[in-house]
């Protein structure tokens, strides 16, 4: 039974907190939390809920607002009293509500929240468990709640968290309707009385609450006034103070005459300090996403974007939409101008899309809301259907969220397509976020086709401009069945590559893919617009050819068959096979890879991975094919030499040298570059006419025991067969 104490006419009742609530308060008061600021968010959120309730009731019964039409939240710091007061004109609480809601009936979330806290959850999740009010004790030693409901008298609730609270009828200043929460702050929490700190917390957590939040501050300003004005001021001030105590009014008898007679004289002035109450609305940026997109200017979107992201630049593009029907939500999505430096740092929590439920902020890093490849998109999603107390675990299972995610991805792709029509801006977008689009092609099979339309590449015919795959297809020759591409390190490198010689000479366009992620992208993007994507660096490249060309190719195959066999014998396991090439024009040979193996570029990328899987490296790298150019004089002369004497040591040496050089020109790395270099140096010496034996005789100390013997040496040939 509550204790009853009689204070004159006032009846004060004391109640014990329900055990779980007492335990929760003890936990809040006695544990150190770094982000105490969330108490303000919780109290504002509660005020907003109370305002939502009265607004909802007034829809069916407008007279409910007779006790106060204005729906608002006021914040009043009082440094002299060390109190921070929050006032709302919401629905208020009856005496029974006050006793039940603030202490005697535990919410279902109380126990769950304590368990979560003890398991390491953040205190900021308190609101999700419906016990946000108690976060006031993070900063306050005593809390007083004065409340007035339309159906009851005005009551005051008070507690210093000692296991009990009191409730009494309140005969102080009438508040009309709503709730006033007065926090008596702890000595070390006075920062929440500072204008800067309150504004900072409201901006961070509550700037998009749907009701005006006004900060009331007592300020001083200097006022310059003439002496006679000073007298007037004094008179006015005394008039104002008359309510408090009767004071004689000062009259300036004859001041008018003095004024008139002294018009030409310079008036004496003095500065006085006057106190005034400054009112500032802290959330002027109303939830912009709830408004009609047609009524919002680009400047307003820009302001909202900057306040949301703290970016100093304007956004590049914006998509504002709402979805209605079985599911209702609104979203406002922005593309920034630049990619953040840590765009693909997985360990860093991204807070790009803020999730609201009916205008109340829920969380700012909701991974389930958007796929990773769109992690650069900034904005807000406001759902009407999700429950307010939703937790991260529930989000992962939520069907509603899956539908929202699907819609967001769809709208993002629409936004990119719209942006693609503006060449200048799309160029900026593509420079910043092309990796994301390519990652999307790798990961998102559903939207792969739409994403592929957004890709832009340099090609052998596009010059300095980048071109889309659609434009490439529109320029294809009638006989051309495939889209030809080459991957590599730079545009210059791939443009001068031996692989593109014949393709370009025949007038076919080649797409230049020069980013490491392109390799992953084309593994998934097998075709575009019904045309298969074919790498010019892999085996089986088929170029459209007429009967004459086919006949010539057959003749070359027969003519060079023996040389191919010999080269395969010499190179042994280094290559899978040696064939005649249909892709070379001016280069003597090149190394191609098998259709499903890695390209040279992919091999380079994989070797650079710090955490690579060596077992995969083995079988993906192994398949190399040497292709020789039948029209090249080096190859023709080598064929003649081999036919004259297939055991000629020079032939073996030249075959290995050709192979190693082809490895380099095809983008591979050598396993033993030193041996290759020594061979080249010998060739240079031969070219310069330097006698190897003379040099060795002059510098006996420099002779290394296992130095490579002269080019024609027997040993050298056998040694070269072992070297890759």
UniProtKB/Swiss-Prot annotation:
Protein's UniProt name: Heat shock protein HSP 90-beta
Q: Where is this region: Disordered?
A: 222-270, 695-724
Q: Where is the composition biased (Acidic residues)?
A: 225-244
The UniProt keywords, alphabetically, are: Acetylation, ATP-binding, Cell membrane, Chaperone, Cytoplasm, Glycoprotein, Membrane, Methylation, Nucleotide-binding, Nucleus, Phosphoprotein, S-nitrosylation, Secreted, Stress response, Ubl conjugation
Sites where N6-malonyllysine occurs are at: 399
Q: Which residues carry this modification: Phosphotyrosine?
A: 301, 305, 484
Which positions does the site annotation Cleaved under oxidative stress cover? Answer: 126-127
> GO terms for molecular function, please?
ATP binding; ATP hydrolysis activity; ATP-dependent protein folding chaperone; nitric-oxide synthase regulator activity; protein dimerization activity; receptor ligand inhibitor activity; TPR domain binding; unfolded protein binding
């Amino acid at each position: 039974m509550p204790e009853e104490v009689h204070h004159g006419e006032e009846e004060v009742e004391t109640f014990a907190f329900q055990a779980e609530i007492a335990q929760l308060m003890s936990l809040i008061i006695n544990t150190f939390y770094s982000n105490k600021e969330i108490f303000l968010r919780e109290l504002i959120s509660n005020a907003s809920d109370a305002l939502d309730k009265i607004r909802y009731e007034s829809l069916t019964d407008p007279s409910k607002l007779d006790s106060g039409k204005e729906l608002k939240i006021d914040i009043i710091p009082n440094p002299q009293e060390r109190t921070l007061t929050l006032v709302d004109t919401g629905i208020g609480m009856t005496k029974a509500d006050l006793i039940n809601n603030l202490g005697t009936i535990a919410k279902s979330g109380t126990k769950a929240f304590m368990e979560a806290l003890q398991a390491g959850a953040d205190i900021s999740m308190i609101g999700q468990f419906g016990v946000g009010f108690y976060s006031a004790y993070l900063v306050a030693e005593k809390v007083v709640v004065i409340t007035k409901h339309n159906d009851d008298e005005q009551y005051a609730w008070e507690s210093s968290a000692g296991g009990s609270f009191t409730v009494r009828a309140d005969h102080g200043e009438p508040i009309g309707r709503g709730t006033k929460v007065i926090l008596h702050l702890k000595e070390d929490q006075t920062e929440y009385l500072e204008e800067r700190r309150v504004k900072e917390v409201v901006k961070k957590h509550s700037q998009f609450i749907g009701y005006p939040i006004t900060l009331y501050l007592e300020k001083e300003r200097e006022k310059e006034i003439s002496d006679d004005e000073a007298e007037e001021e004094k008179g006015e001030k005394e008039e104002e103070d008359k309510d408090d105590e009767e004071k004689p009014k000062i009259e300036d008898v004859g001041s008018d005459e003095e004024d008139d007679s002294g018009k030409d004289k310079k008036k004496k002035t003095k500065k006085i300090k006057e106190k005034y109450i400054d009112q500032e609305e802290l959330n002027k940026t109303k939830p912009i996403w709830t408004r009609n997109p047609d009524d919002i200017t680009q400047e307003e979107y820009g302001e909202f974007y900057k306040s949301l992201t703290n970016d100093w630049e304007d956004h590049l593009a914006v998509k504002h939409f709402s979805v209605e029907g079985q599911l209702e939500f609104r979203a406002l999505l922005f593309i920034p101008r630049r990619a953040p430096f840590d765009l693909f740092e997985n360990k860093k929590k991204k807070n790009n899309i803020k999730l609201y439920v009916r205008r109340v902020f829920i969380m700012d890093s909701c991974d389930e809301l958007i796929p990773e490849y769109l992690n650069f998109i900034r904005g807000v999603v406001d759902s009407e259907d999700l429950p307010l107390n939703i937790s991260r675990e529930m989000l992962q299972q939520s069907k509603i969220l899956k539908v929202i995610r699907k819609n967001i991805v769809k709208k993002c792709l629409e936004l990119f397509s719209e942006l693609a029509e503006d060449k200048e801006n799309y160029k900026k977008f593509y420079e910043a976020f092309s990796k994301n689009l390519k990652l999307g092609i790798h990961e998102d099979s559903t939207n792969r086709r739409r994403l592929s339309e957004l890709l832009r590449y340099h090609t052998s015919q596009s010059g300095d401009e980048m071109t889309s795959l659609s434009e490439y297809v529109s320029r294809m020759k009638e006989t051309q069945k495939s889209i030809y591409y080459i991957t590599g390190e730079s545009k210059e490198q791939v443009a001068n590559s031996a692989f593109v010689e014949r393709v370009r000479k025949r007038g076919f366009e080649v797409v230049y893919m020069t980013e490491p992620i392109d390799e992953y992208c084309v593994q998934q993007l097998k075709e575009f617009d019904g045309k298969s994507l074919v790498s010019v660096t892999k085996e089986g490249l088929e170029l459209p050819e007429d009967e004459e060309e086919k006949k010539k190719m057959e003749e070359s195959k027969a003519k060079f068959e023996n040389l191919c066999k010999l080269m395969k014998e010499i190179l042994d396991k280094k290559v899978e096979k040696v064939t005649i090439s249909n892709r070379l024009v001016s280069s003597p040979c090149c190394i191609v890879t098998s259709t499903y193996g890695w390209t040279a570029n992919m091999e380079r990328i994989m070797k650079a991975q710090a955490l690579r899987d060596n077992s995969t490296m083995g079988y993906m790298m192994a398949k190399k094919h040497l292709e020789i150019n039948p029209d090249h004089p080096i190859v023709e002369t080598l064929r003649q030499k081999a036919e004259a004497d297939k055991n000629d040591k020079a032939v073996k040496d030249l075959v290995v040298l050709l192979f190693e050089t082809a490895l380099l020109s095809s983008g591979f790395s050598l396993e033993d570059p030193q041996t290759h270099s020594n061979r080249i140096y010998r060739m240079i010496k031969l070219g310069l006419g330097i006698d190897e034996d003379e040099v060795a005789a002059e510098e006996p100390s420099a002779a290394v025991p296992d130095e490579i013997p002269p080019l024609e040496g027997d040993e050298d040939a056998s040694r070269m067969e072992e070297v890759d």
